[in-house]
Regions:
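Oxidative protein folding and maturation machinery
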Residues: 1-154
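Solvent-exposed coil/turn segments that connect beta secondary-structure elements
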Residues: 40-43, 172-173, 208, 251
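Short active-site neighborhood of thiol/selenol oxidoreductases, capturing the structured segment around
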Residues: 156-186, 201-205
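Active-site lining segments that contact anionic ligands and/or coordinate catalytic metals
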Residues: 162-165, 197-200, 242-243, 251
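Structural microenvironment flanking redox-active thiols in thiol-disulfide oxidoreductases
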Residues: 180-219, 232-235
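Short, internal strand/loop/helix patches
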Residues: 215-251
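Non-catalytic, surface beta->alpha helical segment in thiol-disulfide oxidoreductase systems
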Residues: 240-272
Length: 272
């Protein structure tokens, strides 16, 4: 049967208080553990889509508590837990919904990995996601990795780059958004000035190793940049959205993540 939203008490009148109540009690009337939903997935999926709509107006704390309620009940059954984790992947992580939230998705990943009911093979995908979700987040130190220059054998490490700021630009010359971003970064006079003054290193990285296609495109990048490739970039970075821009400071601490040229220029200007 379709789920029924909780009745919000009439005494709660302001939108924020009503949304807090709604998200706190969202799963009260929903039969989360019902195995019939495994063959009627559209019902829990629609319930989850509506839940993400309320997430947008509810507080972070209330949202995470409500997710915890859902997972505690779902965790009693391996198939039910995996169904909700898959739905959450679709609407919170893979970008098929109107809200992407790694913070809200991470509890689903942890629940699957912590479950004694789920076998190792079915955990593999979530184990990989956990690695990506817990690396290279805002405020963290950038995970060190090796890169190499076009046609050269010698490998370099990011931690050895000496500059007040490093702009890590992960991109693929075959992707249209990447081509546009490359153009915008290359015509930025303020970035060029920072590079020439030694305050900024722009490290453009192709994440899939030194391919012939990539080698054929390296001439398109500005000569002031460090243009390089790395192996297995998807083990270090979340590459669902390309290009990816990270601004790190002299200690390789991430101060901007999945950012824009405007944000980078603003931070560099503020830190003159």
């Amino acid at each position: 049967r379709p789920y029924q939203l909780p009745d919000i008490p009439d005494s709660l009148v302001t939108p924020d208080v009503r949304s807090e109540y709604l998200i706190a009690h969202y799963w009260d009337n929903f039969d989360i553990e019902n195995r019939a939903y495994l063959d009627a997935r559209e019902i829990p999926e629609q319930a989850f889509v509506d839940f993400t709509s309320i997430m947008r107006i509810a507080s972070r704390e209330s949202t995470l508590k409500s997710i915890d309620i859902l997972l505690k009940r779902a965790s009693s059954d391996e198939d039910i837990l995996l169904m909700y984790a898959d739905i959450a992947d679709k609407y919170l992580y893979s970008g098929e919904g109107h809200l992407v939230s790694e913070e809200a998705y991470l509890p689903f990943v942890k629940a699957v990995l912590d479950s004694k009911k789920v076998d190792k093979l079915r955990k593999l995908r979530y184990s990989y996601q956990y690695d990506v979700l817990t690396k290279n987040q805002l405020g963290m130190e950038l995970t060190d990795f090796e890169y190499k220059l076009p046609g050269k054998e010698k490998k370099f490490r990011v931690e050895k780059l000496k500059a007040p700021f490093v702009l890590l630009y992960i991109n693929d010359p075959e992707c249209d958004d990447c081509s546009l971003t490359t153009l915008r970064l290359s015509v930025s006079q303020s970035l060029l000035k920072e590079v020439r003054e030694g305050r900024l290193v722009i490290l453009s990285v192709y994440p899939d190793g030194e391919t012939d296609e990539w080698l054929g495109s390296v001439e398109k990048y500005p000569k002031e940049w460090v243009v390089a490739s790395m192996e297995n970039g998807d083990r270090y970075f979340d590459l669902r959205i390309m290009p990816a821009l990270y601004l790190v400071d002299k200690d390789k601490k991430i101060i901007l993540r999945n950012t824009s040229l405007e944000e980078v220029e603003k931070i560099l200007k503020e830190n003159k």
